């Protein structure tokens, strides 16, 4: 799913003051890097699931009924027919709606509505799939900005690849994977809140 997040790019001068705010765009090279990253993350998660070892997975569950009701109401108000009040849509169906409103006056409001409809992705020690990416296995094995979950699963995979058997891996990392997942999910929320506050301060300065 390709939902426009409305992310902005802040332009700062030499003294760190905000002198411009622009809509963030990504080029072809960045899209290629993202594809490589997604493939690496998917392969790492699949490897861990097949080996049945403790791991830190990135989990994104499907939208809940209450959020789908709100999205349904929004789409109806925009004259778009859907069945989302009765059953969970597939990411392909949501993507088709996004494509249908692209370039229309409804594009921004529909994008925002879909973003709010989505469940919050979290870290968990058990694989539950990634709804938005339509993947059975996913983890944050690599990323442009290094995350603790990346380092946690590097540690686990290094141990396994060095020959540690499955039973020892389970004893050594079951508790670790659970705690790392919980703490990483909690700290991610705090980091996002701080990031948004900082961004708001720069926007206000501009």
What are these regions (language model features)?
Residues 1-206:
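Electropositive polyanion-binding surfaces
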